[in-house]
């Protein structure tokens, strides 16, 4: 099964949206295989956002993402990277469809509630940045027989 990395950002944590995010993914049929609640250390922020470090918006992004705790998760399921991106909505909440997480809960691109990996390759990289292999738990949901053909 495919895996993806999701992170409820500080604004989502402060607004009490962790449970809402988990509920949406569980009800869709995906399973969480790892999670952690923490304030991200600078070194890991630099590694996670390595492609943005030289961009002019990075100092603000770094200040925001380290301003409070985040809730980090690894989810598993068929086509989860694409489906999770659809569930999350457009990066800019102004263009996010109603019914998506950002469409329902975010107003500003700089505080858009949640991060989700944009490809399988990115997911694998981000999972490795934030979790050790032994922190990922494999199990079978009791309802998997009703989720997949």
Curated annotation (Swiss-Prot):
GO terms for biological process: CTP biosynthetic process; GTP biosynthetic process; UTP biosynthetic process. One of its GO terms (molecular function) is metal ion binding. The keyword Cytoplasm applies. It holds the Pfam family NDK. Keywords: ATP-binding, Cytoplasm, Kinase, Magnesium, Metal-binding, Nucleotide metabolism, Nucleotide-binding, Phosphoprotein, Transferase. Its cofactor is Mg(2+). It is found in: Cytoplasm. The keyword Kinase applies. InterPro entries: NDK-like_dom, NDK-like_dom_sf, Nucleoside_diP_kinase, Nucleoside_diP_kinase_AS. The active site is at residue 115. It comes from the Archaea. One of its GO terms (cellular component) is cytoplasm. It is an enzyme of class 2 (transferase). ATP binds at residues 9, 57, 85, 91, 102, 112. It catalyses: a 2'-deoxyribonucleoside 5'-diphosphate + ATP = a 2'-deoxyribonucleoside 5'-triphosphate + ADP; a ribonucleoside 5'-diphosphate + ATP = a ribonucleoside 5'-triphosphate + ADP. PANTHER family: NUCLEOSIDE DIPHOSPHATE KINASE (PTHR11349). Major role in the synthesis of nucleoside triphosphates other than ATP. The ATP gamma phosphate is transferred to the NDP beta phosphate via a ping-pong mechanism, using a phosphorylated active-site intermediate. Belongs to the NDK family. NCBIfam families: PRK00668.1. This is Nucleoside diphosphate kinase. The lineage of its organism: Archaea, Methanobacteriati, Methanobacteriota, Stenosarchaea group, Methanomicrobia. The gene is ndk.
